[in-house]
Amino acid sequence: MVTIYTKNNCRQCMMAKKWMEHRGIEFEVINLDESPEYVEHIQELGFKAAPVIEKGDFVFSGFSPDKLRQLV
């Protein structure tokens, strides 16, 4: 399962979600503004900005269609 860590009013977060929805990829959304307990997890992974997209050991930040394709 793919997890997208998002924030409110995050344009790249919206783009990543739409990209995955358009391709029928199932994903879980965790909004860091609404669930701040996940912020520490994101920081431990080495990231400071949303979106952070995680599937197993494959984790990256930002909207990157090339990296998103690797999830499929």
Model-derived regions: residue spans:
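Conserved helix-turn-beta segment immediately C-terminal to the redox Cys motif
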Residues: K17-P36
